Amino acid sequence: TSRGSCSFTLSMNPRLRSCLYRGCYGTIMTMETSAATCDITGVIAGSICGFEMFAEMDLKVFKSYILIKEVRLRHCMDPALTAAIISRESHGGTIRQDGWDHKGLKFGLTQLDKKKYRPVGTWDSKEHLLQAVGILTDRIKANQKKFPTWSVAQYLKGGLSGFKSGTEATATPADIDDVISDIIARAKFYKRHGF
């Protein structure tokens, strides 16, 4: 469907519960990333191992964010992906001053750019997360309309690219960069840790 790979109804049948847990926009654990993997020497900048190291540092903070799992119900988005975006952008809100970046241009757990979006709510509020995940799902749907032959993984990655850049749809699959691989690698880590 245009909403993703699952139909969304309010009944809580087993298929829907499974769909809500993983989200309607692809299965994170099967998605490939373009970053280098770890080798015996350990963490490499820009590697899956490096991305997961940062995700692990933020894991304690996410245990208290019940909102991440609540937002999935509204937008049918995998909570592991939401946690990964928050980890990538704000380390769970631990490194931001009153929710703003050091230049005062990006706001909240997901660091929405005020030039591209009009952030709502407080920096760590349900309203902020609903807005950010809503923007992401809109970007995914824009790619579904523009590129009907893309795979589910390309829709999700293209949506993430559009979310980060502030554009409605990605131009080509090649526009999907290392930042997206970082987010997917972190999402896989969070999926393995209960999200």
Where would I find each of the regions flagged by the language model?
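Non-catalytic cell-wall polysaccharide-engagement segments
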Residues: 2-46, 54-61, 73-75, 113-195
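Mobile, glycine-rich extracellular loop/lid and propeptide segments
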Residues: 65, 69, 90
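Residue-level detector of well-ordered alpha-helical segments, enriched
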Residues: 77-82, 105-108, 155, 159
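A short structural micro-motif
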Residues: 88-92, 166
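Extracytoplasmic/secreted cell-surface and envelope-processing proteins
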Residues: 94-97, 171-172
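Short, surface-exposed glycine/acidic/tryptophan-bearing loops
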Residues: 96-118
